[in-house]
Design a protein with these regions (language model features):
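Short Cys/His-rich Zn2+-coordinating modules
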Residues: 20-31, 58-64
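Histidine-centered nuclease catalytic patch
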Residues: 42-76
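A boundary/linker detector
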Residues: 1-28, 113-140
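Short microdomains enriched in Cys/His and/or Lys/Arg
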Residues: 2-12, 61-74, 98-113
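Short, flexible, mixed-charge glycine/proline-rich loop motifs
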Residues: 27-37, 67-71
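Extended, acidic-biased charged interface segments
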Residues: 86, 90-91, 98-125, 129-132
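Short Cys/His-centered divalent metal-binding micro-motifs
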Residues: 46-49, 73-101
Length: 140
């Protein structure tokens, strides 16, 4: 029975599309960012307990999908207010980001328009990399 489950799992892995693999990698990337940054919104600075925080992208995944896993581009935001209601609250995000990572790195993000098409192998590597980073952070 255990062998059958293992074979089933392998079979399911082979059926995953690039979209599935990127979604899984994004989940692990977001978990890592939330653990790395804690519960403090980069845009409004709130640390209120009981509200949901998410991994907000400075340059959105829709506008700059090549930056979707770039850690300079992703920071914790309060979900309901800054990330959703204010569509990322970029007017407050940018100054806080400059303070956090410096103007040069923010300008590099803003000027990075080189498209990148992720492959299935890259998506698997990205997922594994973020799982490992999260594990390392958890043990510190």
């Amino acid at each position: 029975a255990a062998l059958d489950r293992k074979e089933l799992r392998k079979g399911r892995e082979k059926l995953k599309t690039l979209r599935d693999l990127l979604a899984e990698a994004q989940v692990w990337c977001n978990k890592y960012v939330r653990f790395r940054d804690g519960n403090k919104c980069i845009s409004c600075g709130t640390t209120k307990p009981g509200i949901q925080y998410c991994a907000g992208h400075f340059r959105s995944r829709g506008a700059a999908s090549h930056l979707r896993f770039n850690l300079d581009n992703i920071h914790v935001q309060c979900n309901k207010y800054c990330n959703s209601a204010l569509s990322g609250n970029i007017s407050a995000y940018r100054p806080a980001l400059i303070e956090k990572i410096g103007l040069d790195r923010v300008l590099a993000l803003e000027n990075d328009n080189e498209p990148h098409k992720f492959t299935s192998e890259e998506a698997k590597e990205i997922k594994a990399s973020f799982k490992l980073k999260l594990k390392e952070l958890d043990h510190e």
